[in-house]
Amino acid sequence: MSLLLRDFERADALDAALSERLIDGLVAAIDARGEAILAVSGGRTPAGLFKCLSEAPLDFSKVMITLTDERCVPLDHPDSNAQMVERLLLQRNAKQSRFIPLYDSAMDRAAQCQSLNLQFNRLPIFDAVVLGMGLDGHTASLFPGATGLPAAMDLSSDTAVTLIQPLTAPHARMTLTAARLLKTRALILHVTGDEKLSLLNEVRAGAGAMQYPVGLFLAQNAPATEVFWAP
């Protein structure tokens, strides 16, 4: 297990450092290939990060942004990750970026999943993926015990996006699979709080990936997971 841990005294210091880390990678991608692609998570944790990113001096017209996962709810629902991204990240300088949402409430879910797979399998590998983590060890929408979890965690799978039903959280989800999330140049885990740090240490000690799906990502060496943590 190759894991790089960066810890900060305050969440705002973490947000600034992680934003700088991501911008450096996106700039390098644009310089090398003319475009960059970033996958971000929703939830409460990345709110400050999104604000930092939105203000960064970057040519966002050359950046694609997508989500690691999405709840199957309308865009105006308070649990919508896309709504959060549009409200906090796709502002100021980042307004120019191209956003790829994972859910449209007007479409049939199965048809939408098929369409997303075609789209994501045509996209290049990510330049950075920013994951979060729940206290149950889930990341993206890879929840312990969820219907569809083994297939979504299969690293040999060609499936990029799958529909998953958590047993312990509301709403069906569209999630990028583990195999697609790991097609990235940089893999970052963004976590806050002492409880989550304790869980990380437990997972690093050898808890199984089906018990704590985040463990699958922490176990990767290429790319190694970069953990950004603050209390």
Model-derived segments and spans:
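Absolute protein N-terminus
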Residues: 1-2, 231
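N-terminal active-site beta-alpha-beta segment that forms phosphate/nucleotide-binding
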Residues: 2-112, 119
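Conserved phosphate- and dinucleotide-binding cores of soluble alpha/beta proteins
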Residues: 13, 74-231
